[in-house]
Amino acid sequence: MNLLDPFMKMTDEQEKGLSGAPSPTMSEGSRGSPCPSGSGSDTENTRPQENTFPKGEPDLKKESEEDKFPVCIREAVSQVLKGYDWTLVPMPVRVNGSSKNKPHVKRPMNAFMVWAQAARRKLADQYPHLHNAELSKTLGKLWRLLNESEKRPFVEEAERLRVQHKKDHPDYKYQPRRRKSVKNGQAEAEEATEQTHISPNAIFKALQADSPHSSSGMSEVHSPGEHSGQSQGPPTPPTTPKTDVQPGKADLKREGRPLPEGGRQPPIDFRDVDIGELSSDVISNIETFDVNEFDQYLPPNGHPGVPATHGQVTYTGSYGISSTAATPAGAGHVWMSKQQAPPPPPHPPQQPPPVPQAPAQPQAALPQQPQAPPQQPQAHTLTTLSSEPGQSQRTHIKTEQLSPSHYSEQQQHSPQQIAYSPFNLPHYSPSYPPITRSQYDYTDHQNSGSYYSHARSQGSVLYSTFTYMNPAHGPMYTPIADTSGVPSIPQTHSPQHWEQPVYTQLTRP
């Protein structure tokens, strides 16, 4: 309400129209005031809130008092204040302080303050565009460059001020301002409490394994660091004080170490934490986690292929083997495509694979069959065929194992008329990475139902399909024993000759 007081007075003393004006000019104020004798410039200077502090420092001090008094009183005060030795008051600091609220005896200025105040005033007059902060930095640098003889006048003036201060305030004892001291105490208390709280909190969150404590932990640590480092000024956003935060960061790092043992997940914010300090604990944890995860994908354990025997969708790791129908008794001829053959060793054939019966059948014989377009009827259920075609196909597979394209053609010409999507090509090609592309189109997998099994020779079988495999996991190529539990035949066949080495490379990504 201080700013409104003069206007309220003016409404009493002046014409009503002026009261509506939010910022009447100074000349109007002097005209309407009981003491119009004051010059316009004086009144302007003594009403800084409407002039945006033109002269600033002296007037700010009496700003709240001025508003309560008529212009003549204010002019007299301003003239007295102009004669006052302002070197005794470090005005830049005073502007920010709460001097208006309570009388506060300031400490006597030290030599640097004497220098900075005088130099700041001179420079501010010469270069009004200079930002105050830049000015302060420059003054500090210059002060460090001064030699003793250059500093002597300022040191002497500071000593004189100190003696004068002692005279003026004999019982003066320096006490930090209560507001700031409270802030300091709070910062220390917060630092203590938060450092004690961080570990239980962080461990609790780590145990939950869902909410990484890093962000909250770091913010908790930032705030004490920033409070303690910046107790002189208003708190700033936690990200700004780089140096002040260091102690906090160190605390987090120190407490980051127990976390891996306390919780099974080490959720550390690696942007702020030195990884070198955490490497042993964190990496050991990661190792165990990864090993467990990958072991479950590895075919040598035997789980990828066998679970399919029950016809349920088994999800081993990232891919599911869904063999939805039990293969007929002929499943002895059930084959997984060669791409699954690569890991023969993990699954020793549970019964001797039938020997291909028509090895001599030329691959050219198949093209007589009309080529089934890859997206042809989703031939998951294939017409029942004698095991001979399956075996002949096996024969072709054997002969064609190294030429993927012919093999896929054979499949497409195969008597079953199964729509073999071109995805078979990547599987039969020695390089596995292409499989990733093919694997992702799951609909095509289903279209080529026997895509993964030569069991297509057995009729009306929904062929187990791997859903969405990642070549990084070896099991992608593991033979699936179709629902009859018969081992995939190709294990004994040559495909392992070219696929096995690649398989071994892929087992451990």
UniProtKB/Swiss-Prot annotation:
Compositionally biased region (Basic and acidic residues): 56-66, 160-174
Sequence motif: 9aaTAD 2, positions: 290-298
Gene3D superfamilies listed in its UniProt record: High mobility group box domain
Ranges of Pro residues composition bias in the record: 341-359
Modified sites of kind Phosphoserine: S64, S211
Example GO BP: positive regulation of transcription by RNA polymerase II
InterPro entries membership: HMG_box_dom, HMG_box_dom_sf, Sox_N, SOX_TF
Single annotated GO MF: DNA-binding transcription activator activity, RNA polymerase II-specific
Protein name per UniProt: Transcription factor SOX-9
Species in which this protein is naturally found: Sus scrofa
Gene assigned in the entry: SOX9
